[in-house]
């Protein structure tokens, strides 16, 4: 990913979150070195996949979601190799930064994922963008949330299947200095209403980079980030209101309510990933009627290729 100056980052509102630096004693510094080397409790280990539901039904659907931070760069970093090995039934991508007429040819080589749908801004090359790739042809596909103010940046794809509706989203970042926080709040309200309407028709699966760490357990340094994009009271409240109003359940926290150090994003700065100084910004949210079908919700923290890692959902439908 090319380095961007502060001015450009503030304008586009997509500046990666930075962690506040704190002075460390020699003892603390040694502890940090040990943790970075994997000797402390800080690193997250993805447990073995659970491929049956609570009632014993075997998983029939595997969905993966990944903010790739640029399709072309992600492919160069062997992101497609991971997808081929993971072999999802549906793959959702965010921050593709690629218009549909410039999609890399390698995407056509993905085994089975022949039904491909893309959305990108019409006037901003190399910005935002989402993709949805599926083995099965959806019954219906639509783009955006039906409001002009929010449908200019290629952030949402909706795919309807027989037993559920899948929404993949790249939610707007409030930006460095919170320059887009007011816009983000308008988005949150409109998105919530949109999802509630969808959920009234069929059970809903929402996945993607939702650009908020919901609770303090969902980021490494909560105290230092309460005024930073992704952890403001307004964004956290908006997320909570969405969970209640639609309603939706956080699949990872449903299964792992107290699991700490489970993050999906790490800034490129300050060796954040090796120290696991991260944020959980990527989610699979489910209608409550789908919870009996939930087998597992995974964070593939060892998969490289972006400043986010992929997440995987198993359902027994």
UniProtKB/Swiss-Prot annotation:
Cofactor: Mg(2+); Mn(2+)
A GO MF label: 3'-5'-DNA exonuclease activity
Catalysis: reaction(s): a deoxyribonucleotide-2'-deoxyribose-5'-monophosphate-DNA + H2O = a 5'-end 2'-deoxyribose-5'-monophosphate-DNA + a 3'-end 2'-deoxyribonucleotide-DNA + H(+); Exonucleolytic cleavage in the 3'- to 5'-direction to yield nucleoside 5'-phosphates; a 3'-end 2'-deoxyribonucleotide-3'-phosphoglycolate-DNA + H2O = 2-phosphoglycolate + a 3'-end 2'-deoxyribonucleotide-DNA + H(+); a 3'-end 2'-deoxyribonucleotide-8-oxoguanine-DNA + H2O = 8-oxo-dGMP + a 3'-end 2'-deoxyribonucleotide-DNA + H(+)
Residues at the catalytic site: 170, 209 (proton donor/acceptor)
Keywords assigned: Acetylation, Activator, Cleavage on pair of basic residues, Cytoplasm, Disulfide bond, DNA damage, DNA recombination, DNA repair, DNA-binding, Endonuclease, Endoplasmic reticulum, Exonuclease, Hydrolase, Magnesium, Metal-binding, Mitochondrion, Nuclease, Nucleus, Phosphoprotein, Repressor, RNA-binding, S-nitrosylation, Transcription, Transcription regulation, Ubl conjugation
Modified residues (Phosphoserine): 18, 53
Binding site for Mg(2+) 1: 69, 95, 307
InterPro entries: AP_endonuc_1, AP_endonuclease_F1_BS, AP_endonuclease_F1_CS, Endo/exonu/phosph_ase_sf, Endo/exonuclease/phosphatase
Ranges of compositional bias, category Basic and acidic residues: 15-37
Residues marked Cleavage (site): 30-31
Region (Mitochondrial targeting sequence (MTS)): 288-317
Subcellular location(s) of the protein: Nucleus; Nucleus, Nucleolus; Nucleus speckle; Endoplasmic reticulum
A GO CC term attached to the entry: transcription regulator complex
Top-rank taxon: Eukaryota
Modification N6-acetyllysine, positions: 6, 26, 30-31, 34, 196
S-nitrosocysteine: residues carrying this PTM: 64, 92, 309
Family: Belongs to the DNA repair enzymes AP/ExoA family.
Function: Multifunctional protein that plays a central role in the cellular response to oxidative stress. The two major activities of APEX1 are DNA repair and redox regulation of transcriptional factors. Functions as an apurinic/apyrimidinic (AP) endodeoxyribonuclease in the base excision repair (BER) pathway of DNA lesions induced by oxidative and alkylating agents. Initiates repair of AP sites in DNA by catalyzing hydrolytic incision of the phosphodiester backbone immediately adjacent to the damage, generating a single-strand break with 5'-deoxyribose phosphate and 3'-hydroxyl ends.
Entry protein name: DNA repair nuclease/redox regulator APEX1
Natural source organism: Rattus norvegicus
Organism lineage: Eukaryota, Metazoa, Chordata, Craniata, Vertebrata
Gene name of the record: Apex1
């Amino acid at each position: 990913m090319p380095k961007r100056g502060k001015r450009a980052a503030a304008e586009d509102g997509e500046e990666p979150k930075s962690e506040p630096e704190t002075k460390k004693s020699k003892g603390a510094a040694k502890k940090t070195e040990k943790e970075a080397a994997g000797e402390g409790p800080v690193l997250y280990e993805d447990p073995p996949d659970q491929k049956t539901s609570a009632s014993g039904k075997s998983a029939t659907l595997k969905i993966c979601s990944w903010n790739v931070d640029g399709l072309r760069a992600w492919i160069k970093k062997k992101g497609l190799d991971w997808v081929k090995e993971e072999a999802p039934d549906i793959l959702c991508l965010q921050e593709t930064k690629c218009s549909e007429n410039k999609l890399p040819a390698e995407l056509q080589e993905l085994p089975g994922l022949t039904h491909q749908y893309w959305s990108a801004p019409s006037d901003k090359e190399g910005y935002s963008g989402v993709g949805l790739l599926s083995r099965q042809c959806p019954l219906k596909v639509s783009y955006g949330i039906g409001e002009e103010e929010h449908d200019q940046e290629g952030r949402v794809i909706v795919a309807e299947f027989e037993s559920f509706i899948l929404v993949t989203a790249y939610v707007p970042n409030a930006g460095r200095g919170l320059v887009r926080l007011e816009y983000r709040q308008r988005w949150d309200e409109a998105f919530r209403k949109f999802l509630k309407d969808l959920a009234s028709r069929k059970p809903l699966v929402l996945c993607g980079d939702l650009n908020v760490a919901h609770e303090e357990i969902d980021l490494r340094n909560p105290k230092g980030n309460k005024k930073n994009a992704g952890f403001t009271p307004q964004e956290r409240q908006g997320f909570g209101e969405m969970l209640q109003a639609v309603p939706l359940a956080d699949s990872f926290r449903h299964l792992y309510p107290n699991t700490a150090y489970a993050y999906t994003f790490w800034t490129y700065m300050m060796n954040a990933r090796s120290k696991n100084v991260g944020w959980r910004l990527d989610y699979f949210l489910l209608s409550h009627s789908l919870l009996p079908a939930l087998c597992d919700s995974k964070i593939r923290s060892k998969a490289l290729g972006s400043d986010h890692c992929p997440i995987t959902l198993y359902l027994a439908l």
